[in-house]
UniProtKB/Swiss-Prot annotation:
Gene that encodes it: lpxA
Enzyme class: transferase
InterPro entries documented for this protein: Acetyltransf_C, Acetyltransf_C_sf, Hexapep, Lipid_A_LpxA, Trimer_LpxA-like_sf
Name recorded for this polypeptide: Acyl-[acyl-carrier-protein]--UDP-N-acetylglucosamine O-acyltransferase
Organism in which the protein naturally occurs: Rickettsia canadensis (strain McKiel)
Record's subcellular location: Cytoplasm
Amino acid sequence: MSNSNIHPTAVIAEGANLGKNVKIGPYCIIGAEVVLNDNVELKSHVVIEGITEIGENTIIYPFASIGQPPQILKYANERSSTIIGSNNTIREYVTVQAGSQGGGMITRIGNNNLFMVGVHVGHDCKIGNNVVFANYVSLAGHIEVGDYVIISGLSAVHQYARIGKYSMIGGLSPVGSDVIPFGLVSSKRAVLEGLNLIGMNRKGFDKAESLSALKAIKEIFSSEGNFAERIKQVAEKYKNNSIVMQIIDFLNQDSSRAFCHFEK
């Protein structure tokens, strides 16, 4: 391949196997047993070590780390590997760690996947094709993920779990069990618990007015009947309370999302 595709600050160990039209950006580090197939692009500051193969047309963004040893105490420098397929997009700060003796010695990722910022793929995971992992998804070791799975941001999956094909995991979800194919799972969403009275007091809001506003939001969100009508009634009842009126103004604005309510 042409040296013009390799930045002069990149460190490529002797023995690394680079395919056609591979592009390696500034300050990347490539180990001696790494295979980069045709048209792989490393943006900058990417570290790929161990026995690792990256499939063609895969793009890896800055500060990703691929092929490092598994994070397990019993790892004994066994020659495990990391195999990543073709047409993957691996964004900033993604970590993919090599397999271990207890898991078949291979961490394997398929084709056409998107790994957003900060995703962690633990040792011995087996990931299919066309999956999307949103920001900071974390997979422990030995996890199997089927094709076309979507895992939303900041979700974590327990070791040895199986995530069936075409399933979706909602954001901020701790997944400790298998997810059936086509399943939709999510953790409990945030609920309204009141007003930030301590913070309001620190910012100089009148205490009596704040407590009155707390009563007002309970009337809005906890009472029976039509929600829009309750907003109108509270707006009239508390029209001299500036805190309530700011809340009413917020409630009357157009939004693509629902409001957090008190837990029922």
